[in-house]
Every structure is written in structure tokens, then in C-alpha cells.
Amino acid sequence: MSLVPLVPIGDTLAHIADERTAAEHREALAVLEDRLRAARAEVEAGWGPAYVDRVHKKGKLTARERLAMLIDPGTTPREVGTFVNHGDVFPGDQKSPGAGVVTAFARVEGRWCMVIANDNTVASGAWWPRTPEKIQRAQEMALRLRLPTIYLVDCSGLFLPEQSKSFPGARGAGHIFKMNSLLSAHGVPQLAGVFGDCIAGGGYMPII
């Protein structure tokens, strides 16, 4: 990925707003940024501390802990699709923060990669409605940018009560495997590490 230099454009703040107005806007923006950080923290918490503890008691790491160990020291992963399914409530008052999968641009061995990791703090890494779309979107970006794609697999398959919403349509789960094939056909490296459950759709990832 290329470095894009940022240069100022347009008038300076002093030319378009007085200090009082600028201060009011800064305060309003700070409130919105706090809300964004809180929402991001909620997604990153998955189903909560009890589920993080359950993962650790199995001797495993969470998806984001694995991601932190994978990336180059001193670098920061850039998550995409963080708020997919955020605020949605499924039958039984179930939630799927981030659609149960972490997708992120990350530096690995000095090279930008796309990382796709099942969030094992959300229904043991199950796929939910819009999980396939999120994975496919990450694969599409990897294909366009020719980024090696790394799958961190710890997946219990589809979340069965919602499976009818995950398979059908032009963006259904099967199209993930089409993207696997397209990435291979275009010479984009794909690697998979299996760290736990590898069931149903999730089981195809390291094979294809």
C-alpha cells in the first residue's frame, strides 16, 4: 500500500469561524468521538468478560489477542467493518458485535496484509447474518490491493437459528469460497491458521 501525503486544502479555520464557534465545534466533536470510542469498545468486548474468560480457560487467545501477536511490533491494525450488526438484536435477545468476525489491514513481516479472524468471544466464532458479506468485502479489498490474506480460524459454523439469512442471495456464504478461488487465480497468497473449532463454513476456509 502506498503512502498518501496529506496536505492542507481550502481556508484555515481562522478564516471560516471565530474562536467561540470553533471551540463549540471542537466540544461537539469531542462528544461524538467519545461516543464512537465507547461503541468501538462495546464491539471489541464481544459477549463480555465472561466469554473472554471462557476462551482463556480453554487455553486459547481471543481473536484480537491473536491479531496483536501476529502484527509487526509497534504497528497498529486498521479494522474495517467494525460496526457491522452493531445495535441489531436477533431472536432470543442475541447480539453479534462486529458480525462475529474481525477484519483488519495489518503489517506482517513488513508487508500489508488483510487479516480475517473469527471472534471466538461471540458464539464461539459462529457466522451470523452479514458475516459472509463482511468477510467477502475484506476479500474484495485484498484482491483489489493484491494483499496477502490471513485467516485466523476458530469457528463453530453458522449460528443455526439465523442460518436462513446467511446462505441465500448474491452475497451468501457460498460466495466467500468464490472469492477464495479468485484470490488464488490472481496469485494473491492466502494462509490459514486453525486455533480451535473448524466446523461447517469455517472449516472450508483453510481447505480452499
Question: Where are these predicted regions, by residue range?
Answer:
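Terminal-region recognition feature
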Residues: M1-A192, G196-D197, G201-G202, I208
